[in-house]
Every structure is written in C-alpha cells, then in structure tokens.
Curated annotation (Swiss-Prot):
Native organism: Staphylococcus aureus (strain N315)
Family of the protein in this entry: Belongs to the aerolysin family.
GO cellular component: extracellular region
Gene Ontology biological process terms, A to Z: cytolysis in another organism
Matches recorded under InterPro entries: Bi-component_toxin_staph, Leukocidin/Hemolysin_toxin, Leukocidin/porin_MspA_sf
Protein name in the entry: Uncharacterized leukocidin-like protein 2
Pfam families hit by this protein: Leukocidin (PF07968)
Extent of the signal sequence: 1-27
Keywords: Signal
Length: 351
C-alpha cells in the first residue's frame, strides 16, 4: 500500500514538473516572440527612418560656434536622378553664417554618380560591325546664372591631377578667410572644413583654364588604360581589341577583351566630388546655379572573325548629359530645384 502511495506521489510530481516545464517553455517562447517582434518593429522603424533620410532632400543641420564666436552652419542637400541618362546629381549646400564677414558664404559639394553606360553593339550595315561604346570622359560644370553679386572665389580640385585617388580639404575661418590643402584633415582649430575624396584610376582630372568667378568646369579624361596584362592609351585604336574566330556580328562582345578586366571608371562609372566656394552680397536675396553632368563616349569598331582589317576609333562620338538648375534663397538658407532636363548625343566639347 505504501509502495502504491509512493508511485502515485512520484507520478503526480512528474506531471507537475512536466506542466511547469511546458508553461516555462511557452512563456519563454512568448517572450522571445515578443523580443523578435520588438526587434522587427525597431528595424522597420529604422528602415523607415533611413528611407525618410534618403528621400528628404531638404536636410537642415545647424552647428553653433563652429566658425569662431556665434558662427553656425546650415546644411541642405538636393538630389536629382535622371533615368534616361542614368546620371545622379547629389549636391550639398553648406551655408556659413559668419557675423565677422559682410557677405553670405556658401560651399557647394557636387557628388552623385555618372554610370558608365558601357555598351556592345552590332551594326550589320558596316564591315566593322562590332562596336564598343565606353566612357572616355566625364564632365562636371557649375555656373552662376546671370547674377554678378554672387561670385566663385575658390574650387577643388585645382589644375591637373593624375593620381589614382584625389583627396583635398577646404577650410574656412572667420572673417572670410579660406585655404585648401592636399589630403584629408582640418587645417586650423578655429575653422570649418570640407573634404573631397574620389577614385579616378587610369584617368586624369583637369580643371578648365577658362574658369572664372561665375563658371567652373572639371574634366575627368581617360589616359593609359590597364586591363588584364594590357596597357593601352585612350588614343590607341587597338584598345580593348581582340581578334578571334568565335566573334560574330550576333555576339559583338566577343570582339573585345573581357569587360570584367576593364578599369572601374570604364566598367562601372564615376562618382565625382568637386567643391565650390562662393560669396554673395547681402543685398541679393536669391541666386540660381546651373549644374551639368556629362558622359562622353568613344566608339571602338572591330570586324568579327579572323581578318587583317584594322579597328576604327572614333573619339567623343556620343554623349549624354543632365542639366539641373538650383535656386538658393540666401535669407532663409534654402535650396530648391527649378528646372531639369537631359539629352542624348550631346558629348561635351570645350569652346
């Protein structure tokens, strides 16, 4: 009888333990589900916040006491993308409020992307029917529209730069003083600095010799292009050339070296970072700026199959551009897009 009681008690204890374990597991599972849901909601909110940050083109950030006593910076950003040309303009406008200077001050950083639009084409009507269109030049143009009260006082980069990477820092200090240096870093403890940094391997940056107080232009031009074990100049008609019997007019890509070996600016595109420093007379309330991003394309024409016909090179034969007009309100420190258009078959030509 005692043994039966012990068995019943043990059985009851086992059931109780199992029920308690199940309840604990269910509670833990519910707690985990709650945590996962909270995490998901947190991630969703973060993603929504990030999307708002990306789509909010009128960003505003004020940093007091950054330019000496009572100085501050107001930052705005405008982004314009054109699907037809596959070009994106992203401009940062930094308004510098300096009580020791009698003019408005503005830094404009021109960023974004100019996609390569690398293309292999077939043109059966020509003997050299297999074509390669590649971006031989990229151009960024900035000009003040019909307003002599707003002037460009400095720019980055300057002159000609042939290094694979470009790094420069612009620094503004109270009283309208400014300076620029190579590399990334602040030039003084009591100043506001802005840096530019971009890659241009196998290309050169050239600031136009015709730049003035209302117009600046930069060209990023292909030089000696390295791909695989080859190095050929942009002016060489044998650039990217491949003579093979498997190439046909139906497969123009086979008449050229593998595109995966091409330099990044040929294969993918260019991400500019150019800077302009401007001053404005305080009697002038608004100024418009016209910004143009352009892609120039060379065309290489090869004949498919085994042959002895020379390839053909046509420089700056094609091009696409995006032109955007921005209006700055100096009093309210705001920026808006007032006009935009794009077109094809418009390679940049100086002059």
């Amino acid at each position: 009888m005692k043994n039966k009681k012990r068995v019943l008690i043990a059985s009851s204890l086992s059931c109780a333990i199992l029920l308690l374990s199940a309840a604990t597991t269910q509670a833990n599972s519910a707690h985990k589900d709650s945590q996962d849901q909270n995490k998901k909601e947190h991630v969703d909110k973060s993603q929504q916040k990030d999307k708002r940050n990306v789509t909010n083109k009128d960003k505003n950030s004020t940093v007091p006491d950054d330019i000496g006593k009572n100085g501050k910076i107001t930052k705005r950003t405008e982004t314009v993308y054109d699907e037809k040309t596959n070009i994106l303009q992203n401009l940062q406008f930094d308004f510098i409020d300096d009580p020791t200077y009698d003019k408005n001050v503005l830094l404009v950083k021109k960023q974004g992307s100019i996609h390569s639009n690398l293309k292999f084409e077939s043109h059966k009507e020509e003997k050299n029917s297999n074509w390669l269109k590649y971006p031989s030049e990229y151009h960024v143009d900035f000009q003040v529209k019909r307003n002599r009260k707003t002037e460009i006082l400095d720019q980055l980069p300057k002159n000609k730069i042939s290094t694979a990477k470009v790094d420069s820092t612009f620094s503004y200090s109270s009283g309208g003083k400014f300076d620029s240096t190579k590399g990334i870093g602040r030039t003084s403890s009591n100043s506001y600095s802005k840096t530019i940094s971009y890659n241009q391997q196998n290309y050169d940056t050239i600031a136009s010799g015709k730049n003035n107080n209302w117009h600046v232009h930069w060209s990023v031009i292909a030089n000696d292009l390295k791909y695989g074990g080859e190095v050929k100049n942009r002016n060489d008609e044998l650039l990217f050339y491949r003579n093979t019997r498997i190439a046909t007019v139906e497969n123009p890509e086979l008449s050229f070296a593998s595109k995966y070996r091409y330099p990044a600016l040929v294969r993918s595109g260019f991400n500019p970072e150019f800077l302009t420093y401007l001053s404005n007379e305080k009697s002038n309330e608004k100024t418009q700026f016209e910004v143009t991003y352009t892609r120039n394309q060379d065309i290489l024409k090869n004949r498919p199959g085994i042959h002895y016909a020379p390839p053909i090179l046509e420089k700056n034969k094609d091009g696409q551009r995006l032109i955007v007009t921005y209006e700055v309100d100096w009093k309210n420190k705001t920026v808006k897009v007032v006009d935009k258009y794009s077109d094809d078959n418009k390679p940049y030509k100086e002059g």
